[in-house]
């Protein structure tokens, strides 16, 4: 979530095919099958955060929201033909800064999804938002058109850290936005970034305890990483930015687990914590290797077709993507069928991030061979992985060396 100058469309009047009270939207007749997700990428921001390498863009001259909406709806038509008769369990508006979209735009996209597929009665519909006062004023509109989960990009709880991270809001605005979000939405998540420059274990413990006291049902807690091509990377390479690494980074991660679990928000994924039952259903689709359609500039998709997994991605430039959609009906610039080995490696990579781990039988079914028993037994004996009930999971010690585990198991 990360900010822009957009003229929003008005909120439309209620429509007969739309319900926002938990009822199923008018669907096409379809068979029930594995959950399917739709990710919608809104790429525009008010400002680019110096640590961010996401596909986000600043347009000081404003954005033609109506024209972009027409492109989103047209690309949805295309994906409906690629993945027909699916049951949509989640919709996720990400970015960029989706809270710069008008509620009318969000509503039209949800309606289009409901018209193309079955939108499940209890579908999770998440929108990422920044906590600025202007964007917080839109929360009621988003709830009215069907959004039922809000994810706030808080990132830090003190003004000095927010300024260092290039954020556009203050700590007071963040707390006010969080309180407002909890009034409008039953499910609220917010993000924090830790392992920031100069941050000590004591300071992070105090900040995290404060965050846990706000009683959101989901927290995403990310260690700051230096991403190539960002202003932070340039400063880091020049010796002007120093972030915790090694033993301190490890200590901060362990401290995070020690504080969150007793507070009722255990880690269900490396960086994500939730009260049981409040996990992000959309992100679980990714980590469980299930299918999803990615709509918008730079969005990625995974769609099973003919028993094989297709990996699709779109043009990153917003205007370039829109031009292609207007000309061809979609903005895709890559459509690759993964080999059995590639699909298995991806399932391994994603599944080991989860506390629940991955299904070993499913992994073996993907590539026909499964994992090397000798390597697996060695990692078990080192206390890095566990096998139980046909599932493989990284232990807390294993999650500290997750990249090593994946490399060894995928070899």
Listing of model-derived features with the role each one plays in the protein:
Residues 40:
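Conserved N-terminal Rossmann-fold NAD(P)-binding element of oxidoreductases
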Residues 367-381:
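Short amphipathic alpha-helical interaction segments
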Residues 380-390:
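A short, conserved structural fragment
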């Amino acid at each position: 979530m990360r900010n822009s100058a957009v003229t929003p469309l008005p909120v439309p009047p209620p429509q007969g095919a739309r319900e926002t009270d938990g009822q199923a939207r008018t669907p096409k007749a379809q068979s029930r099958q594995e959950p399917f997700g739709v990710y919608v990428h809104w790429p525009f921001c008010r400002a680019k955060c110096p640590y961010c390498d996401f596909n986000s863009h600043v347009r000081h001259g404003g954005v033609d929201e109506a024209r972009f909406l027409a492109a989103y709806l047209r690309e949805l038509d295309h994906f409906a033909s690629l993945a027909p008769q699916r049951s949509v369990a989640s919709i996720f508006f990400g970015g960029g800064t989706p809270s710069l979209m008008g509620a009318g735009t969000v509503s039209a996209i949800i309606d289009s999804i409901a018209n193309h597929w079955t939108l499940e009665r209890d579908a999770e519909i998440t929108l990422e938002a920044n906590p600025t006062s202007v964007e917080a004023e839109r929360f009621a509109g988003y709830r009215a058109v069907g959004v039922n989960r809000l994810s706030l990009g808080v990132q830090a709880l003190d003004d000095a850290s927010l300024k260092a991270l290039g954020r556009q809001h203050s700590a007071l605005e963040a707390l006010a936005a969080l309180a407002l979000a909890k009034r409008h939405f039953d499910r609220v998540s917010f993000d924090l970034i830790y392992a920031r420059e100069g941050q000590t274990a004591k300071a992070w413990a105090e900040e995290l305890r404060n965050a846990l006291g706000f009683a959101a049902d989901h927290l995403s807690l990310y260690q700051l990483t230096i991403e190539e091509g960002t202003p932070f990377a340039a400063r880091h390479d020049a010796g002007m930015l120093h972030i915790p690494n090694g033993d301190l980074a490890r200590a901060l991660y362990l401290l995070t687990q020690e504080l969150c679990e007793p507070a009722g928000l255990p880690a269900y994924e490396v960086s994500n914590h939730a009260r049981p039952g409040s996990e992000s259903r959309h992100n679980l689709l990714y980590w469980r290797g299930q299918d999803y359609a990615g709509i918008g500039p730079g969005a990625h998709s995974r769609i099973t077709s003919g028993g094989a997994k297709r990996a699709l991605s779109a043009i990153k430039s917003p205007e370039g993507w829109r031009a292609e959609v207007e000309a061809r009906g979609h903005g895709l610039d890559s459509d690759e069928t993964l080999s059995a080995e590639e699909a298995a490696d991806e399932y391994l990579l994603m599944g080991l991030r989860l506390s629940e781990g991955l299904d070993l039988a499913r992994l073996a079914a993907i590539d026909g061979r499964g994992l090397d028993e000798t390597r697996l037994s060695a990692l078990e004996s080192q206390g890095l992985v566990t096998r139980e009930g046909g599932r493989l999971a990284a232990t807390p010690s294993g999650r500290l060396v997750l990249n090593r585990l994946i490399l060894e198991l995928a070899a």
